[in-house]
Swiss-Prot record:
It is an enzyme of class 5 (isomerase). Belongs to the pseudouridine synthase TruB family. Type 1 subfamily. Its EC number is 5.4.99.25. Gene3D superfamilies: Pseudouridine synthase. Responsible for synthesis of pseudouridine from uracil-55 in the psi GC loop of transfer RNAs. The lineage of its organism: Bacteria, Bacillati, Cyanobacteriota, Cyanophyceae, Acaryochloridales. Keywords: Isomerase, tRNA processing. This is tRNA pseudouridine synthase B.
């Protein structure tokens, strides 16, 4: 098996749970995913099968989410699965006040990861250390938020705001909910999250975990999933050099140090790095 699956992750399980279930269903050990989703979250989870796992680092880092922020409370996990650590209500909050604060969360921003996250500190996941009662100091990270669009506003004692967010890898929507609530002085936590796009895959073409089986394997090709890369078709002579790890002389390559998808007879044979008139093998896939 070789290729990608556009999996619609269900709520209540981890991304690794999905991998384990697919290994059982497909009787295939070599399976990986292209970006962790929290257990409460649903939506697009790119899955790589077989040697396609070697292409996971080259997925587009652009992701899109629909998230609902609940104001008037804060939680230990920055989402509604955590314990409430502050609760004051926010019935006075208006959409106009929120819209005044949103621009500061667009662009390159500093973001402090949630205490309960998969980031490793001193070889341990943050969530494991938090569950053990440790308070770990983690420096903020620079993340990119390309766009925030308001989809729905529901006033009330604990008003809720639904947003369409487009961002880069490493952005925590939970942290965005927390920080927006802090900026408004009322607290905020993430009430719901769906990833609608990741690695070039969209929710409209996703498949449920229950529907995937060896006899029903809706694979996407590397060319589809890595459509953000330029692609180059090799001839037979170039392919021989490629398979032996030698740089291939090519015309019309993109600027130096660009990633390029490589095919032969329309089949993906890897990824290279451009350098002048030569393409240097980075990932070589052989049949």
């Amino acid at each position: 098996m070789f290729g990608f699956l556009n999996l619609n992750k269900p709520a209540g399980c981890t991304s690794h749970d999905c991998i384990n279930e697919l290994r059982r269903r497909l009787r295939l050990k070599r399976i990986g995913h292209g970006g962790t989703l929290d257990p409460m979250a649903t939506g697009v989870l790119p899955i790589a099968l077989g040697a396609a796992t070697r292409l996971l680092p080259y997925l587009s880092d652009r992701k899109a989410y629909i998230g609902t922020v609940r104001f008037g409370m804060s939680t230990t996990t920055d989402d509604i699965t955590g314990e409430i650590c502050q609760e004051q209500g926010a019935s006075h909050l208006t959409l106009a006040a929120i819209q005044e604060q949103l621009p500061q969360f667009i662009g390159e921003i500093e973001q402090l990861p949630p205490a309960y996250s998969a980031i490793q500190v001193a070889g341990q996941r943050l969530y494991a250390r938090a569950r053990a009662g440790e308070v770990v100091s983690v420096p903020p990270r620079i993340v990119t938020v390309y766009r925030i669009e308001v989809l729905h506003w529901q006033p009330g004692r604990y008003p809720e705001l639904t947003l369409h967010i487009t961002c880069g890898s490493g952005t925590y929507i939970r942290a965005l909910a927390r920080d927006l609530g802090t900026a408004l002085g009322v607290g905020g936590t993430l009430a719901a999250l769906q990833r609608i796009e990741s690695g070039g895959l969209r929710i409209e073409e996703s498949h449920s975990l229950e529907s995937i089986a060896p006899e029903h394997l809706p694979l996407c090709s590397p060319q589809e999933v890595l459509s953000h890369l330029p692609w180059l078709e090799l001839n037979a002579a170039q392919l021989n050099d490629w398979y032996h790890g030698r740089a291939v002389i090519c015309e019309g390559l993109p600027p130096a140090d660009s990633c390029v998808g490589v095919t032969f007879a329309t089949a993906c044979v890897g990824v290279g790095i451009s350098g002048g008139d030569r393409l240097h093998p980075k990932v070589v896939l052989k049949e």
